[in-house]
Amino acid sequence: MGKKVVIIGGVATGMKTAARLRRRDKDSEIIVLERGPELSYGACGFPYYIGGEVKSFNSFDHTPQGAKRDSEYFRTVKGIDARIGCNVTAIDRPAKKVTYVENGEVKELAYDVLVLGTGSTPVRLPLENADAKGIHSFWFPWDVHAVEAEIKERNVTDVVIIGAGFIGM
C-alpha cells in the first residue's frame, strides 16, 4: 500500500509536484490543499497575456486539449484529490497531521509525507493610497482580469511596474 502524501499549495509547485509524484507512484494517496479558489495556473505567463502575446487566458488553467485543470480534472484524470478553499492553519510534525479550515469547518488530516508548495504573496507597499483605483497586484487570475478591464476602461497607455521578479519583468 502506498503512502498518504499531503501537499499544501495547489498552484504551480504543488500541482506539478502532485502530478509528477502520481506518474512515479500509482499507489500513494495524494491530497492537495489549496487556500484559493483556483488550481494549477501559470502566473509567470500573465504579462504575456496582458501584452497580447498569449491570446487566450484559458492557456493558463486549461490543458492543451482544452480541459480546465480543476478539482474534478485532477481527481478523474490524474487520480489526485485536489481541494480548493482549504486554509491550512497548523502543522503538527510529530503527530504527522495538518489542521485546515474548509467551508468554515476545522478539519485535521494525517499524512505520511508532507510537501510545502505554498508559493508567495505579493507585497503591498506600506504607502498612503496603496489601494487606490489604478493600483493593482498582478499575481492571481482575478488580478489579471482587473488590470485588463482597467486598461480597456481607461484606455491606459502608460504603466509603472514595481517589482523585478519574473512577473514584474
Give the ranges of each region predicted by the language model.
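Glycine-/small-residue-rich active-site loops that bind phosphorylated ligands and cofactors
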Residues: 13, 38, 90, 106, ...
